UniProtKB/Swiss-Prot annotation:
One of its GO terms (molecular function) is adenine phosphoribosyltransferase activity. Pathway: Purine metabolism; AMP biosynthesis via salvage pathway; AMP from adenine: step 1/1. This is Adenine phosphoribosyltransferase. Pfam families: Pribosyltran. It catalyses: AMP + diphosphate = 5-phospho-alpha-D-ribose 1-diphosphate + adenine.
Length: 188
C-alpha cells in the first residue's frame, strides 16, 4: 500500500483541500481484482480532524441553505452523507442496492464491466422540489452516480449538487454526468 502522491494535485475546492484528501488516500494494488489500484479512503474517515475539515469544506462549498436533504450512495457514501447532513442540520436518505429497502422503492439499473447493478430509493423519500445534495466517496465511470441522480429526480427531488471526495478523472465519470455539475475534492 502506498500513499497517493500529493504533488500536482487538483480539486474543485482548491489545492489545500485536495492535498488533505490526497495525503489520506492509500493505494491498494490488485484490489478487488488483479490490475485494479483501489483508492482506500478509510484513513481519511478515521482521522477526526481531517474528516471534519473535509465535511466543513463541502458544506461551505454548497452553502448550508442550498439543500434540504443529503443522499448517500451505498456504502461509503453513507459515511460522508451522514456527516454532511449532521453538519448542515438536515436529514439523510440512503440510496441502496436492490432489495435492501423495506418499503416501496424506485429502482434504476446501470451497466457494470460484466453485467448490471440496480440501486433503489424509497418512493416517499422526498417531497416535490426537495433540494437534494448527492454525495459519494469516489466518482469513477459515473454509472452509479447517474443512476442515483435519476432516482432522486424520479422520487420528486431536485438535485442541488453532486459531491465526491475523490474523482478518478481518467475514467470519464464527470463527462457522463454533463450537464450536471460535479464537485470533487480531489481529482486524480
Amino acid at each position: 500500500m502506498t500513499e497517493t502522491h500529493t504533488t500536482g494535485v487538483r480539486g474543485d475546492s482548491g489545492r489545500e483541500t485536495a492535498e488533505l484528501v490526497a495525503s489520506r488516500v492509500l493505494d491498494v494494488p490488485d484490489f478487488p481484482k488483479p490490475g485494479v489500484m483501489f483508492k482506500d479512503l478509510m484513513p481519511l474517515f478515521s482521522d477526526g480532524d481531517a474528516f471534519r475539515e473535509v465535511i466543513d469544506d463541502i458544506v461551505r462549498y454548497h452553502g448550508r441553505d442550498s439543500f434540504d436533504t443529503v443522499v448517500g450512495i451505498e456504502a461509503r457514501g453513507f459515511v460522508v452523507a451522514a456527516a454532511i447532513a449532521y453538519a448542515a442540520g438536515v436529514g439523510v436518505v440512503p440510496v441502496r442496492k436492490a432489495g435492501k429497502l423495506p418499503r416501496v422503492a424506485y429502482s434504476a439499473s446501470y451497466a457494470l464491466e460484466y453485467g448490471e447493478a440496480t440501486l433503489e430509493v424509497h418512493q416517499d423519500a422526498f417531497t416535490a422540489g426537495h433540494r437534494v445534495l448527492v454525495v459519494d466517496d469516489v466518482l469513477a465511470t459515473g454509472g452509479t452516480a447517474e443512476a442515483t441522480l435519476d432516482l432522486v429526480e424520479r422520487a420528486g427531488g431536485t438535485v442541488a449538487g453532486f459531491t465526491v471526495l475523490l474523482e478518478l478523472g481518467f475514467l470519464g465519470g464527470r463527462e457522463r454526468l454533463t450537464p450536471r455539475p460535479v464537485h470533487a475534492l480531489l481529482t486524480v
